[in-house]
Amino acid sequence: MEHIYQDAWIIPFIPLPIPIAIGLGLLLFPTTTKRIRRIWAFFSVLLLSIIMIFSVILSIKQIDGNPIYQYVWSWTINNDFSLDFGNFIDPLTSIMLILITTVGIMVLIYSDNYMSHDQGYLRFFAYMSFFNASMLGLVTSSNLIQIYIFWELVGMCSYLLIGFWFTRPLAANACQKAFVTNRVGDFSLFLGILGLYWITGSFEFRDFFEIAKNLIDNNGYNSFFLTLCTSLLFVGAVAKSAQFPLHVWLPDAMEGPTPISALIHAATMVAAGIFLVARLFPLFTVIPYIMNIIALVGIITLLLGATLALAQRDIKRSLAYSTMSQLGYIMLALGMGSYRAALFHLITHAYSKALLFLGSGSIIHSMENVVGYSPDKSQNMALMGGLTKYAPITKTSFLLGTLSLCGIPPLACFWSKDEILNDSWLYSPIFATIACLTAGLTAFYMFRMYLLTFEGHLNINCKNYSAKKNNGLYSISIWGKMGSKVIQNNYFVSTMNNYEKITLKAKQIDDNGISNMMRPFITINKIFDNTKTFTYPYESDNTMLFPLFVLVIFTFFIGYIGILPFDQGRIHFDILSKWLIPSINFLHSDFNNSFDWYEFLINALFSVSIAYFGIFIALFLYGPAYSYFHNFNLINFFIKRGPHRILWDKIINRVYNWSYNRGYIDIFYAKILIAGIRGLADFTYFFDKKVIEGIVNGIGVISFFVAESIKYVGGGRISSYLFFYLFYVAVFLVICLN
């Protein structure tokens, strides 16, 4: 089946007819194109399904042991320089192809219903298809120049989708923030590519892997410059994957439609940075210090993301910080050299996070009928609660995604996260301790999100009552403690405050908009029984529930592909290792070594205990009023007033303020970095206008007045000109003689 590999070059081009056809249709036949808009959604799903089948065949060939395949077209510019374009198929490529296509198909089916009321429906599907095409081109690229081209296209599509509702100021600002932040990473990536080309004379992966290794082994090149170039490449990945300190764009990217948030966080933009590090992994492993830098950035990011998610009120922002933290785990694994564990967690996290984001979209969709179209209200967990009664199917899927991300067996993320935690103990006890602590924080904030959304009562109907205030530790509740906001130049530092300023008046959905709403192109009847009301939240349509059902299946079973074999030989689901054999033979000579039952159970028991402890704390702090956790004598003992209680309140308040204000990092950038750049720009403008132009204009003005003076003195007579000429000559001679 060699032709399967030879035809792989067409993969990025298969989705392209959709945006082209939509663009031409809107230009030439706008009315007809809008009337048949469901057809475009159908073909978007169909073409991506073809790529998925193609990807599955390629993956099966890789698992069966087929070698890495590369096909290149060379464009010779002159005798000394040529550009090569082609496709590169290896296990990493096949993994990314399956992730992009499977998650992309579910998001497209979901989006048909979610975006059906939106006037930008066609524009959305055009962007989405081009986004998928760009990401597919990125993962099949055979050299760094090709990667950079598709890297920029992926970034462009993400900016368009983040700012999809560009008439909203927050969305426009978020789009600009993502653009500027990623410009830093993209420029660094470009410099790193040029530096590597200057060193190796090639853009091909295999060429500069071998050349760089030979140069280092033979001390044939400046190791500092090579380290600098690889560090610049890594900065590009840091920005794209929202790693510290270039993570600030990710929470604001939630201003885009929820389906695109699911795609960005699961399989496209943020995965692009991880893909770049994984693709260049052979280069990073032979460069001194760079692996330590990758691990350090990963450990900082996973802890920072977890702490910033602790007190967020917006359900999508909470999930965004969760993504940031989980990508930190993947980056940590790559920095430790755990290539297999990193890709394993990339796979499991993608499906779990797609499930959570699409579940949050179902929640937001149902809340909009109660609070109106307002992201500040429909995405605010303070106004939710008790949704189990109204959206039981969404609740079940969201709970399974939450448990998976918490690391509860046998769900997907348990297997991959547990492997990363085990490897971290071998790398650094300090890093391992932080990673385990963050695992507990992950369980806490994820279950906090679930409890605030689905348990208790619908808070919008009882705004002045919160069951959490009955808790002794109400100071970190969603409603907060009496306080104030300090507003400084459009940026505010929020302290613990009550939520009385929230207005419950909402815009009502336009009747004409509802009557003209298009039905989804896929109708799934008699699977789920949904009852809609317009005074309470309701369960989503079957077209939105079907992707949740499919992703639940992935969340249940995808983890089994990476279970390592045991000594007893009772489990043999080591599909992932067989899949990755061509890529990791040179990295882990002993990767086939298996764990015994005892070691596995001890490690699993430890990680699961941490997760359950975080869940217990979340139940204690955010459980509903009828929760039996509030009646424990032990808890009553801890919440008694006293000096220790006051100190504990202060600690909790500081943690809350740190988390809710995003660690003050955005404020630091706004007050120091952005203000400093603007101040420098103002000074440069002043210096240019007042000093530089002042000197130039001053010389002109002085020359003008001198000329005018001489003109009137001379009077136009030749005798006067001769007199002044002789006078100047005499002065010149006197000066010279002296």
UniProtKB/Swiss-Prot annotation:
Keywords: Chloroplast, Membrane, NAD, NADP, Plastid, Plastoquinone, Quinone, Thylakoid, Translocase, Transmembrane, Transmembrane helix, Transport. GO terms for cellular component: chloroplast thylakoid membrane. GO terms for molecular function: NADH dehydrogenase (ubiquinone) activity; quinone binding. GO terms for biological process: ATP synthesis coupled electron transport; electron transport coupled proton transport. InterPro entries: NADH_UbQ_OxRdtase_chlpt_su5_C, NADHpl_OxRdtase_5_subgr, ND/Mrp_TM, NU5C-like, Proton_antipo_N. It is found in: Plastid, Chloroplast thylakoid membrane. Its EC number is 7.1.1.-. It is an enzyme of class 7 (translocase). It catalyses: a plastoquinone + NADH + (n+1) H(+)(in) = a plastoquinol + NAD(+) + n H(+)(out); a plastoquinone + NADPH + (n+1) H(+)(in) = a plastoquinol + NADP(+) + n H(+)(out). It is a multi-pass membrane protein. The chain crosses the membrane at residues 9-29, 39-59, 89-109, 125-145, 147-167, 185-205, 224-244, 258-278, 280-300, 327-347, 396-416, 425-445, 544-564, 600-620, 667-687, 694-714, 718-738. It comes from the Eukaryota. NDH is composed of at least 16 different subunits, 5 of which are encoded in the nucleus. Belongs to the complex I subunit 5 family. NDH shuttles electrons from NAD(P)H:plastoquinone, via FMN and iron-sulfur (Fe-S) centers, to quinones in the photosynthetic chain and possibly in a chloroplast respiratory chain. The immediate electron acceptor for the enzyme in this species is believed to be plastoquinone. Couples the redox reaction to proton translocation, and thus conserves the redox energy in a proton gradient. This is NAD(P)H-quinone oxidoreductase subunit 5, chloroplastic. It comes from Ranunculus macranthus. The lineage of its organism: Eukaryota, Viridiplantae, Streptophyta, Embryophyta, Tracheophyta. The gene is ndhF.
